[in-house]
From Swiss-Prot:
This is Cytosolic Fe-S cluster assembly factor NAR1. It comes from Vanderwaltozyma polyspora (strain ATCC 22028 / DSM 70294 / BCRC 21397 / CBS 2163 / NBRC 10782 / NRRL Y-8283 / UCD 57-17). [4Fe-4S] cluster 1 binds at C20, C52, C55, C58. Residues 362-388, 501-524 are annotated as: Disordered. One of its GO terms (biological process) is iron-sulfur cluster assembly. Keywords: 4Fe-4S, Iron, Iron-sulfur, Metal-binding. [4Fe-4S] cluster 2 binds at C158, C206, C408, C412. Residues 369-388 have a biased composition (Low complexity). Component of the cytosolic Fe/S protein assembly machinery. Required for maturation of extramitochondrial Fe/S proteins. May play a role in the transfer of pre-assembled Fe/S clusters to target apoproteins. PANTHER family: NITRATE, FORMATE, IRON DEHYDROGENASE. InterPro entries: Cytosolic_Fe-S_CAF, Fe_hydrogenase, Fe_hydrogenase_lsu_C. It comes from the Eukaryota.
Length: 524
């Protein structure tokens, strides 16, 4: 990273006594207690720059205060107060956390879901327990629609990457898709449909989600965020024996669905909540975008006209999906970019691209009746002619129409709040625990498909306009799509991106700059 110190970096401080919070695991000793080993030096502990970005442990003073308001002790204290005031408890949990906790307790994911719901109901009195899939589906659909307009192309539900852009790489902000994360939209779905006072606890794989819940546009959607590492501290040994004792017992889909149905709000989708979609264990945004574009371009009579090819990058954390026509030409690309090293490469490549090259173009294809049907596609960032692009080309971030970025190597399944080892026996030392969790994620959580948003009824004069697909001969098509989005969603699902240089400085002695006004903090 650059050693240069910029003026805007000086408007906050890190307290001197704050040490790195990155946990360091130690290998068990084979010696007897009290026995000294001569001639061996202890191994030096190394924490890489990649760890630091994913961890965001070196937090500012304001972020330290915010984080202190989001932990398991705060949840216990606040919920004990709120329930006496007539509040109901709702809990949302990310699928990565369900996988991590199920492996920690040594049971299958479906069995864990059943026992976890029972634990929350009997111990904490939870009224509703939901997954975040419905919120994720709304997030994916909206991100696809924003990306279709061609101005923004970087998608990230990762608060670590978002804060990195806002603090250090403001030049990337115009490319970020301004849609809220699945956690935040789940908060909207829970609270907007409920008439009672609700306390919302969310269990997330990443500590940075705590800061995300305190963003100005998200305050009130999630009342407290904890991670699996903090959740297990709430569970007593007696409760482990009662609810989470290691077992090979499995349950069927009907029993699993029955458990979910009892705790799903009537205004949310029972069939979706605890499932997941195709793609990666981080949400599959890049994969879903390429499916979305294939749907737009495919004829009902010829669904096999386009195929999707997966191309690996130089390391496991870069994957590109390519939509290819029958002649082998690449039409659309979407790319997964995980980990700090790849983010640095992305930053260097995208930083040099001039804004004038962010254009849109129209690709025409014949329809079944022989007429031309124009579909608007996002151009590659360097506006190259995709007709001349060959399938054999290596992965190139600058040619991608859609980028899914996560700070952690391996993505959200490797979030810092997830548990790495089981309650009794950890995974094989020679295996990659993140890869193990990824395999469990993709094979154990029931899958659901995301229906394309194409069924809105339009006036006959606009019959050739579909949400996210713009006909070139309609001058007011952008207005139509904007009105459709605002009619269905308003602006509540939009993300506000903050550039520190545009935020007014905090003046000494100004008592108004408190936690209750987070926009005044230099956190964002």
């Amino acid at each position: 990273m650059s050693a240069l110190l910029r003026e805007e970096d000086l408007n906050d401080f890190i307290t001197p006594e704050v040490a790195c919070i990155k946990p360091v695991s130690s290998k068990p000793s084979n010696g007897v207690d009290g026995e000294l080993s001569v001639g061996k030096e202890p191994e030096k502990v190394e924490i890489s720059l990649a760890d630091c970005l994913a961890c965001v442990g070196c937090i500012t003073s304001s972020e330290e205060i915010l984080l202190s308001r989001q932990n398991q002790d705060v949840f216990v204290k606040e919920w004990n107060e709120k329930k006496t005031e007539g509040y109901i408890l709702s809990v949302s949990i990310a699928p990565q956390c369900r996988v991590s906790l199920s492996q920690y307790f040594g049971m299958g994911v479906l069995k864990f879901d059943q026992m976890f719901i029972r634990y929350l109901q009997e111990v904490w009195g939870a009224r509703y327990v939901v997954g975040i899939q419905e919120g994720r589906e709304e997030s994916i659909k909206l991100m696809n629609e924003v990306a279709d307009k061609g101005e923004r192309k970087i998608c990230s539900a990762c608060p670590g990457f978002l804060m990195y852009c806002e603090k250090k790489q403001q030049d990337l902000l115009p490319l970020l898709i301004d849609v809220k994360s699945p956690m935040e939209i789940t908060g909207h779905l829970l609270k907007d449909g409920n008439k009672e006072k609700m306390y919302h606890l969310s269990i997330m794989p990443c500590f940075d989600k705590k800061l995300e819940s305190m963003r100005p546009e998200s305050i009130g959607l999630v009342d407290c965020v904890i991670t699996p590492k903090e959740l297990v501290n709430l569970i007593t040994p007696e409760q482990v024996d009662k609810y989470f004792a290691t077992t090979k017992e499995t349950i069927g889909m009907l029993e699993w669905e029955d458990a979910i149905q009892r705790v799903t709000p009537k205004w949310m989708n029972i069939d979706t909540s605890f499932k997941t979609n195709e793609g990666s264990s981080s949400g599959g945004f890049a994969w879903q975008y390429i499916l979305h574009r294939r749907f737009q371009m495919s004829d009902n009579d010829n669904d096999n006209a386009y195929k999707i090819e997966t191309v690996r990058g130089r390391n496991l954390d870069v994957t590109e999906f390519r939509l290819i026509d029958e002649e082998g030409k690449i039409l659309v690309r979407s790319t997964q970019v995980f980990g700090f090293r790849n983010i640095q490469n992305l930053r260097r490549l995208v930083k040099d691209v001039k804004p004038r090259k962010l254009k849109r173009f129209i690709r025409k294809r014949p329809t079944a009746n022989g007429n031309d049907n124009s579909i608007s596609l996002s151009s590659s960032i360097n506006n190259q002619d995709n007709n001349n692009t060959k399938v054999e080309e290596p992965v190139d971030f600058c040619k991608s129409d859609f980028l899914e970025v996560m700070a952690c190597p391996r993505g959200c399944i490797a979030g810092g709040g997830n548990l790495k080892n089981g309650i009794k026996n950890g995974p094989d030392q020679d295996s990659d625990p993140n890869q193990d969790l990824n395999t469990v994620y993709m094979t154990s959580i029931p899958m659901t498909s995301i229906e394309p948003r194409h069924n809105l009824t339009l006036p006959s004069s606009q019959e050739n306009v579909i949400v996210g697909v713009i006909s070139h001969d309609l001058d007011d098509s952008n207005t139509i799509i904007k009105l459709q989005e605002e009619q269905k969603y308003g602006n509540k699902y939009k993300r506000k991106l903050y550039n520190p240089s545009s935020i007014s400085e905090t003046h000494n002695g100004d008592s108004k700059n408190t936690i209750e006004q987070p926009v005044q903090f230099t956190t964002w």
